[in-house]
Curated annotation (Swiss-Prot):
Expressed by the venom gland. This is Galactose-specific lectin nattectin. Gene3D superfamilies: Mannose-Binding Protein A, subunit A (3.10.100.10). Induction: Hemagglutination is completely inhibited by galactose. Is not inhibited by mannose, and the chelating agent EDTA. Transmembrane segments: none annotated. One of its GO terms (biological process) is inflammatory response. The lineage of its organism: Eukaryota, Metazoa, Chordata, Craniata, Vertebrata. PROSITE patterns: C_TYPE_LECTIN_2. Residues 38-156 form the C-type lectin domain. It comes from Thalassophryne nattereri.
Length: 159
């Protein structure tokens, strides 16, 4: 009979430790406070306005980059997140730029530029120095803009 209480205690401790390990695993794969999880990344929106390079530097200090967008689902999520946090479809810096070579767009996080959400007619060459990408231009579309313009910005980092 003495072995039954020991087994019960052992079973209880094993379950408790197992649950604790599971909680720890989940906590390490969640986003920090102020960041929102989507897919395999965390996103945070900054209302304060900065030029593109300063916004990228701010994202790097937080362990990420200006957000890259790889499909329509991510674009919809980002548009909704910005609207939810700002109360409007605010024009916002994302990580695209063609500063190295005109017309050759790159993401600042080094990921493949495999999705394009440009507004029809964008990116344009109306102003030659428009090397940085913003989202929420005339809806949920992208636009190339002057990098020195101050905008809100969206950071992203991998889990």
């Amino acid at each position: 009979m003495a072995s039954v209480p020991h087994f019960t205690v052992f079973l209880f401790l094993a379950c408790a430790l197992g649950i604790g390990a599971n909680v720890t695993r989940r906590a390490t794969s969640s986003c920090p406070k102020g960041w929102t999880h989507h897919g395999s990344r965390c996103f945070t929106f900054h209302r304060g306005s900065m030029d593109w390079a300063s916004a990228e530097a701010a994202c790097i200090r937080k362990g990420g980059n200006l957000a890259s967008i790889h499909n329509r689902r991510e674009q919809n999520f980002i548009t909704h997140l910005i609207h939810k946090l700002s109360g409007e479809n605010r024009r916002t810096w994302i990580g695209g730029n063609d500063a190295v070579k005109e017309g050759m767009w790159f993401w600042s996080d080094g990921s493949k530029f495999n999705y394009k959400g440009w507004k029809k007619g964008q990116p344009d060459k109306h102003v030659p120095a428009e090397h940085c990408a913003e989202t929420n231009f005339k809806g949920a579309f992208w636009n190339n803009a002057l990098c020195k313009v101050k905008r809100s910005f969206l950071c992203a980092k991998n889990l």
